[in-house]
Regions:
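Bacterial N-terminal signal peptides that target proteins for export
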Residues: 2-11
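Bacterial N-terminal signal peptides
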Residues: 11-20
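Terminal presequence/propeptide segments associated with secretion/organelle targeting
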Residues: 25-671
Length: 671
């Protein structure tokens, strides 16, 4: 027995290359509206009056923006077993359907009997007679509006009150490390730049380019030099964003344009959406705002999640309007998100393409005419003339090898889960598309995040090197960054913007730590400076030497460890990481902690050691809990160690690889 596969009449997908829409900005404040029944401007025919054999017409667009109609006959009323609970089986006829049958992109095409609205086409059948389709009854489509409507506001969100940690007031502001700690320096190659990284002291700063990175292994089985990110302790992490954006079925049809092919597939998989071939507007076209569009049932419409130089838009059909400016469309969910704030646009159809599996429309979205606020099992709904706030993204890529610089910008729906899951592959897809290649090389990424809760913005710089695929490393980091900002548990951030500057080259820009030599044999005393030479070798270039000094901590005695390593290598073993006990309690503190996460372009130097056994016993006997527990943040502990001189961090314009440790003898009570 042959199985008939049922498919949702997916909207045809059209992605365009267009400029950013300036008036649409990030915001997401929720204004609650009381429930108001949706009353279509067309009279309706209830399902109880629909009988097999009744004939009517469906209205849709098959070319340009002209609404045409084709005949359809009711075959039967089917039990769907879920929402929608009933479906009307129809058989279409006439010249239009003879060419292609019922096609993807006809979702929402209204079905009338005797001038009364019965419902809209929502589903069809794969690999079978494309003249057969399923209509969602209008009574069930009206249930889209039986839900609270949430319309985003352009107002700034209220700031969540936070009590600053008591220890923060005592932190020394604007600390500058003395230049006398750099004893001498050999001359590196002209293209190597090494700069000091200062402590993050101050009133828990929100910005700093020495932030966030994570535990990194020097090599892996496939030879990549990899970077991963251990984003704080699990209980301190941002709220999980593992909300599925669709059910097991493939709701909606999306094909991503303006990004590399594999990042388009990444976004497709994230959306769990079907894709169909697309048309498109001219590259760089700006979708204008149309405050008074001519809207009619049966017209082609587009719904956009991203638009601008990166665009992801679904094209379907408008089903019905109400006098208060609301609409219903599609007759099935787009992504079944519930409340949403996607952009509603006009659409122009180029053609309907016949297919063996299914037919589909080719077209392109046009003017922005409103907002989609409901994405429900029975269809989508929204308002004409209301405009959705959005997040803004700018990506600038400089190809060091060619000397060329490229730029893309786009906006996307300000939905915390969409931002968390779609922004990262969209950004990395822009990088790959502008670079024009996928493979090994070096990427320096500087990302600045802006929003009402980020005073002056928050910035993070990192470098990545791979023998095989440098972009995948960048993707993982951006996923974590976007997750943190979009779904952090402390504060809504809007307007929300991301500016990304990228430098890429095929050359492995790696600086290897080859050797460390301590000046003098010791023993050294607590508080004394220890000088040492670090031999560094750029990839396939002559080595050079830099001389630094660290101060022996006052409490250390016996044998201590002088450790020099690349940022992110063995970061989890750093003493300031292990000693921190206090949890993160605000967005400000979260960002302050991320400011001290190491990056791959840093050289980290530290002296590690233990108190003498006698002092440890004495402290334990005192019974003073404060003496036994360190109620401080990691950032505060690292700043203290940098102030005392036992920890030192410098940043280079290279990826730093290697880890070397030396043992040094310390005078003092070693009992």
């Amino acid at each position: 027995m042959r199985t008939i596969k049922l498919f949702k009449m997916l909207p045809a997908v059209f992605l365009i290359l267009a400029s950013v829409v300036s008036p649409i900005w990030a915001a997401d404040r929720k204004e609650q509206f009381t429930y108001t029944p949706f009353v279509p401007t067309d009279p309706i025919m209830p399902l109880s009056q629909v009988k097999p054999g009744m004939r009517g017409e469906c209205r849709t667009v098959v070319k340009g923006d002209d609404i045409v109609s084709f005949d359809a006959e009711v075959v039967d009323i089917l039990d769907a077993g879920s929402s929608p609970e009933k479906l009307i089986l129809i058989k279409a006829s006439g010249p239009i359907v003879e060419k292609s049958g019922i096609a993807a992109g006809m979702s929402g095409s209204p079905f009338y009997i005797g001038g009364r609205l019965v419902g809209a086409i929502g589903y069809g059948f794969n690999f079978t007679d494309h003249k057969l389709g399923l209509v969602t009854p209008i009574e069930e489509m009206l249930e889209v509006w039986n839900n609270p409507e949430i319309i985003p506001s352009f107002e700034l969100p209220p700031l969540v009150a936070e009590k600053p940690p008591s220890s923060a007031d005592a932190r020394e502001p604007n600390l500058q490390e003395s230049s006398q700690n750099v004893v001498s320096a050999d001359t590196p190659p002209a293209d190597v730049v090494i700069e000091e990284v200062l402590p993050t002291s101050g009133d828990l700063p929100i910005s700093g380019d020495d932030a966030v990175s994570g535990d990194r292994s020097v090599s892996s089985d496939d030879g990549d030099i990899r970077a991963s990110w251990d984003l704080l302790v699990s209980r301190d992490r941002a709220v999980s964003s593992d909300r599925t954006v669709s059910d097991d079925s493939k709701s909606g049809g999306f094909f991503i344009s303006g990004v590399s092919g594999r990042m388009a597939r990444e976004m497709k998989n994230t959306l769990n959406a079907e894709t169909v071939p697309f048309g498109g507007a001219p590259a760089g076209a700006v979708p204008p705002l149309n405050y008074a569009p001519d809207v009619r049932p049966g017209m082609a419409i587009g719904v956009s999640l991203l638009w601008g130089d990166v665009d992801a838009s679904s094209v379907g059909t408008l089903t019905a309007l109400s006098k208060d400016g609301r609409f219903i469309a599609y007759a099935h969910p787009l992504l079944n998100l519930g409340p949403t704030a996607a952009v509603l646009r006009t659409a122009r159809i180029s053609s309907v393409v016949p297919g063996i599996e299914s037919s589909f429309k080719i077209g392109s979205p046009g003017d922005i005419i409103g907002i989609v606020t409901q994405d429900r099992p029975q269809g989508i709904g929204g308002r004409i003339g209301r405009f959705a706030p959005a997040a803004s993204v700018v990506v600038k890529v400089t190809d060091v090898d060619s000397g060329r610089t490229y730029r893309k910008s786009f906006q996307m729906v300000q939905d915390k889960y969409m931002l968390s899951k779609l922004a990262a592959p969209a950004i990395v897809g822009c990088i790959e598309d502008l670079w024009g290649r996928i493979g090994g090389g070096t990427a320096k990424i500087t990302a600045k995040f802006t929003g009402s809760a980020l005073r002056g913005g928050w910035q993070r710089t990192n470098m990545f090197v791979s023998e095989n695929d440098v972009a995948t490393q960048v993707l993982e980091e951006f996923k974590l960054l976007m997750q943190m900002f979009a779904v952090n548990q402390f504060q809504e951030i809007r307007p929300f913007g991301v500016d990304v500057e990228v430098e890429v080259t095929q050359e492995p820009r790696v600086l290897y730590i080859e050797d460390v030599k301590v000046s003098g044999e010791g023993p050294f005393s607590p508080g004394e400076k220890v000088e040492f030479d670090i031999t560094l070798r750029p990839w396939r270039k002559d080595p050079f030497v830099r001389t630094y000094s660290l101060t022996v901590p006052e409490k250390v005695s016996g044998t201590a460890q002088l450790l020099v390593r690349g940022g992110g290598i063995a970061e989890e073993s750093a003493e300031y990481t292990n000693e921190a006990w206090r949890s993160i309690s605000s967005l400000t503190i979260l960002l302050s902690e991320l400011d001290v996460k190491e990056s791959n372009d840093q050289i980290v130097m530290e002296i590690r050691g233990q108190e003498s056994l006698g002092k440890q016993i004495e402290r334990a006997k005192s019974g003073d809990a404060d003496a036994l527990m360190n109620d401080k943040l990691k950032s505060e502990i690292r700043d203290e160690k940098m102030k005392e001189g036992s920890v030192r961090v410098v940043r280079a314009n290279y990826y730093i690889d290697g880890i070397i440790q030396k043992l040094i003898k310390i005078d003092g009570d070693s009992d």
